[in-house]
């Protein structure tokens, strides 16, 4: 009798722990789904509400990304969350449609991230050509290609059952029934489909993103060093003017603070790009590694032998959710620039989200020969908001000839733009969006 009581107590403890685990899982997954819904809905609502956000072509790609992530939160995550909490798949034959939605929405999200990286690299490396070529029509074509490719590798193979591996076999050698398969909604991918879909959905896009963001960093690094050179020239000229006021010839030293500021800016750009790539890779890479490994698992081997490439379902599901979690982080990474922050604060009714900074901004003016003729600090509020940025393109300091660029020449002209004023904001958030190029008269192109 005491033995039976002990056994019942242990079973009750196991049931209680299992129930507690399910409750914690439900709370965590609910928060993840709600945060994904809220963030991406805010992005869509901001663009619908504020016309100036729709006027920027680069925001079209952010909207497409938000829509794909919103579909992940509506069509994919809730159904899997219910199955995780219930311990089985309660939606029957909806499994195949859900698998197609999962592949389509996740692929669309990743491809939109890839398109954004290409768009920002093109905008930063060739701003004049970007201004002419990247029209709303061109943006819609790129977005349509991303979504069409996502549909083609999801619904067509799934509906034709090209994605499935061989039917699962039970221990007695019989093929598992349809009901047993539907209880789990386990889509055992074939080796061919797993590798080909992973290449299109992840490996090729991530390779493109690595190349584009690496080149963006190199361009930004060159630009920051050019700005630092202008700073040093401005401070040097100011120091010399102050020290030679009495007519004496005094040697003027170059300040070390400018070198430190240059390093600080380069580090900030590197951190920004590292966050963009790091979050994406950390979320999706583990899943796609497992996605290519699992089809090679030999589950028919005897229990005593080792089974390489075999992963338990819990581990696989954890990394699936890691990938979907990227959809909740994308609005924070890609839509939290100044324009979107102001729109969010207006929509939410909390205007203190975007406090106005009071740090000083240095204005450096350069004459036609490249000599610095004025350098002074002004409060941030006295500078137009259109100028309150850090240029991340070489053309912001040295002008280019659009005709030369169109013909294939990419070398900047030696002379600087006449009366060009460069705004050097020390604390502004770095943005990798399109920056309006500067024309030959030193004004921003409208």
Swiss-Prot record:
Highest lineage ranks of the organism? Eukaryota, Metazoa, Chordata, Craniata, Vertebrata
Secretion signal: which residues? none
Q: Which family does it belong to?
A: Belongs to the G-protein coupled receptor 1 family.
Instruction: List the GO terms this entry assigns under cellular component, sorted alphabetically.
Output: ciliary membrane; dendritic spine; endoplasmic reticulum membrane
Where do transmembrane segments lie in this chain? 23-48, 60-86, 96-118, 138-162, 192-217, 272-298, 316-340
| GO molecular-function term, one example from the UniProt record | dopamine neurotransmitter receptor activity, coupled via Gs
Q: Which Pfam families match?
A: 7tm_1
Query: Chief localization class?
Result: membrane
Membrane topology per record: Multi-pass membrane protein
Residues with glycosylation annotation: 4
Subunit details = Interacts with DNAJC14 via its C-terminus.
Positions with an attached lipid (S-palmitoyl cysteine) read: 350, 354
Keywords for this protein = Cell membrane, Cell projection, Disulfide bond, Endoplasmic reticulum, G-protein coupled receptor, Glycoprotein, Lipoprotein, Membrane, Palmitate, Receptor, Synapse, Transducer, Transmembrane, Transmembrane helix
Q: Which residues are exposed on the Extracellular face of the membrane?
A: 1-22, 87-95, 163-191, 299-315
**Location of this chain's protein in the cell:** Cell membrane; Endoplasmic reticulum membrane; Cell projection, Cilium membrane; Cell projection, Dendrite
PANTHER family given in the database record? ADRENERGIC RECEPTOR-RELATED G-PROTEIN COUPLED RECEPTOR, D(1A) DOPAMINE RECEPTOR
Q: List the disulfide bonds.
A: 95-185
What exactly does this protein do? Answer: This is one of the five types (D1 to D5) of receptors for dopamine. The activity of this receptor is mediated by G proteins which activate adenylyl cyclase.
Stretches assigned to the Cytoplasmic side: 49-59, 119-137, 218-271, 341-446
Q: What is this protein called?
A: D(1A) dopamine receptor
InterPro entries in the record: Dopamine_D1_rcpt, Dopamine_rcpt, GPCR_Rhodpsn, GPCR_Rhodpsn_7TM
Give GO BP annotations, semicolon-separated.
adenylate cyclase-activating adrenergic receptor signaling pathway; positive regulation of MAPK cascade; vasodilation
């Amino acid at each position: 009798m005491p033995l039976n009581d002990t056994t019942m107590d242990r079973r009750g403890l196991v049931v209680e722990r299992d129930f507690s685990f399910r409750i914690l899982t439900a709370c965590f997954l609910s928060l993840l789904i709600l945060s994904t819904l809220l963030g991406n809905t805010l992005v869509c609502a901001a663009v619908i509400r504020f016309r100036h956000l729709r006027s920027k072509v680069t925001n079209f790609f952010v909207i497409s990304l938000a829509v794909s992530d919103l579909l992940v939160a509506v069509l994919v995550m809730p159904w899997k969350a219910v199955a995780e909490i219930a311990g089985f798949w309660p939606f029957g034959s909806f499994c195949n449609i859900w698998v197609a939605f999962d592949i389509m929405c996740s692929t669309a999200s990743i491809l939109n991230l890839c398109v954004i990286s290409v768009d920002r690299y093109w905008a930063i490396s060739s701003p004049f050509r970007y201004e002419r070529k990247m029209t709303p029509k061109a943006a819609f074509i790129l977005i349509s290609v991303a979504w069409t490719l996502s549909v083609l590798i999801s619904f067509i193979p799934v509906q034709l059952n090209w994605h499935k591996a061989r039917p699962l076999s039970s221990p007695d050698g019989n093929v598992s029934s349809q009901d047993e398969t539907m209880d789990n909604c386990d889509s055992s991918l074939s080796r061919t489909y797993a590798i080909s879909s992973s290449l299109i959905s992840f490996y090729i896009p991530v390779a493109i993103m690595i190349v584009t963001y690496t080149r963006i960093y190199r361009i930004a690094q060159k630009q920051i060093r050019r700005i630092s050179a202008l700073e040093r020239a401005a401070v040097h000229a100011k120091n010399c003017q102050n020290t030679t006021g009495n007519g004496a010839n005094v040697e003027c030293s170059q300040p070390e603070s400018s070198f430190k500021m240059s390093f600080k800016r380069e580090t900030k750009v590197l951190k920004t790009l590292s966050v963009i790539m790091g979050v994406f890779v950390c979320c999706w890479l583990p899943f796609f590694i497992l996605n290519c490994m699992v089809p090679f698992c030999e589950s028919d081997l005897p229990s005593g032998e080792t089974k390489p490439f075999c992963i338990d379902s819990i581990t696989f599901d954890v990394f699936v959710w890691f990938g979907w979690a990227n959809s909740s982080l994308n609005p924070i990474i890609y839509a939290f620039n100044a324009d979107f922050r102001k729109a969010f604060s207006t929509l939410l009714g909390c205007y203190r989200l975007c406090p106005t900074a009071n740090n000083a901004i240095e204005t450096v003016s350069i004459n036609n020969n490249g000599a610095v003729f004025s350098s002074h600090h002004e409060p941030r509020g006295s500078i137009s908001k259109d100028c309150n940025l850090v240029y991340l393109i070489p053309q912001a300091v040295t002008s280019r000839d659009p005709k030369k660029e169109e013909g294939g020449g990419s070398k900047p002209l030696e002379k600087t733009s006449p009366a060009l004023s460069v705004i050097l904001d020390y604390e502004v958030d770095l943005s990798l969006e399109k920056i309006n190029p500067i024309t030959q008269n030193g004004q921003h192109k409208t």
